[in-house]
Regions:
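SAM-dependent transferase fold signal centered on methyltransferase-like domains
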Residues: 1-383
């Protein structure tokens, strides 16, 4: 639930008291109602807003002193993803960016002073952003021109009537309306948006294994497809980029099973760059329509499964018994199989852990029995 402007002002002015109150809460789901009652007793009519702020901050995804409500925190672009976009635009000599749907300012924290301006139609989010970031932020409609920024960023609504939007023309506002008003743009979309007809660059970004967004850049900023894989490492953030920079005859054809089965990062799959990644890593697909890859090594820093045997679906029970399988990770792609139901049906009684990948090769459904997931390291399978 969003805040009123009065509530935002109260939260800004009572930061120290709120921090003190938060430290005294139990902070568990079971104690939630008791915690809310305690905050209402202490802060009166502002207790609800204080409770929501403390709950929104509890995820730890954003700076601890920021103002946020539940929805804005949940919808916020992860700082690492925003930082990648800022770097991308900086590399293209963009001096000033206008974030048309800035919300509480998560994009802004990635930009240097004097290079970012934010606006939003929601007055309470504008007020929170003004507290959170040291950039100009004001209230404005995304379909109006209010600055001379070289590039505008927009994050149209991704749901309508509770359903996730998958078509560009259904976004609110639609990209066509944004492009009619502004020049070069970076339009943030859900990972599953259909970007096949986009004329510029479609950049799909994942962070620590989860696909976070597809960002559509206009033609002046780039073209083609790109997968960006961000991983948090002890030494910092690692960035891997896969682009559609190969000709068709340079891409590997589907082939037989190798030593390992590999499920590529979701950003690679969403960007349509499975074969490009395979070419770079010396891998190939088992089937041209299925994203699983195979080869004789694991790419460094990834994980996969060591192949044991192909098993006909009708002979799965016998195979499980033969390999003494007691626990089973089941992955499904290209087949209508419920992993939980299949696991119950197999009635595992063994003592070893295995992985079963149910997929399709050609017109047939197949089950690929593998060992448990293994991670590539310098001393393991990577060259």
């Amino acid at each position: 639930m969003s805040y009123t402007l009065d509530e935002v002002a109260f939260l800004r002015e009572n930061a120290a008291a709120i921090d003190t109150a938060a430290a005294d809460l139990e902070g568990t789901k079971k104690a939630h109602l008791r915690d809310v009652a305690k905050l209402q007793a202490h802060f009166g009519d502002y207790g609800r807003a204080v409770a929501e702020l403390i709950q929104a901050r509890s995820s730890g995804k954003l700076p601890g002193q920021w103002l946020m409500d539940h929805d804005s925190a949940q919808q916020a672009t992860p700082p690492a993803v925003a930082a990648y976009r800022a770097q991308f635009l900086q590399e293209r000599n963009v001096d000033l960016v206008h974030d048309l749907t800035c919300s509480i300012g998560t994009e802004g924290q990635a930009f240097a002073p004097g290079t970012y301006v934010g606006s939003d139609l929601d007055a309470s989010r504008v007020a929170m952003a003004q507290h959170n970031i040291e950039h100009p932020v004001f209230r404005a409609d995304a379909l109006t021109t209010t600055t001379t920024a070289q590039v505008c960023i927009a994050d149209p609504a991704r749901r309508q009537g509770g359903n996730r939007i998958t078509r560009l023309d259904q976004l609110l506002p639609p990209p066509a309306d944004l492009l009619a008003t502004h020049g070069e743009m970076a339009i943030k979309c859900a990972p599953g948006i259909d970007h096949s007809e986009w004329d510029g660059l479609a950049c799909v970004v994942s962070l620590d294994g989860g696909v976070k967004e597809t960002c559509l850049y206009t033609r002046g900023l780039g073209a083609g497809k790109r997968a960006v894989i961000l991983n948090t490492m002890p030494e910092g953030l690692h960035t891997d980029v896969i682009e559609d920079d190969l000709d068709e005859d340079e891409l590997p054809e589907a082939g037989p099973m190798g030593r390992f089965l590999i499920d590529p990062d979701g950003a690679i799959v969403r960007a349509g760059l499975v074969r490009h990644y395979a070419a770079r890593e010396g891998l190939h697909q088992l089937d041209p329509r299925i994203a699983y890859l195979t080869g004789d090594r694991l790419p460094h820093g990834t994980s996969g499964f060591e192949f044991i045997e192909m098993v006909p679906m009708k002979k799965l029970k016998a195979a499980m018994a033969a390999h003494d399988v007691g626990s089973l990770e089941i992955l499904v792609r290209g087949q209508d199989v419920n992993p939980d139901q299949l696991r119950k049906k197999l009635k595992l009684k063994g003592s070893t852990a295995k992985t079963l990948v149910v997929t399709r090769i050609g017109t047939k459904g197949v089950a690929v029995l593998c060992g448990p997931r293994v991670v590539s390291t310098e001393g393991n399978y990577a060259p």
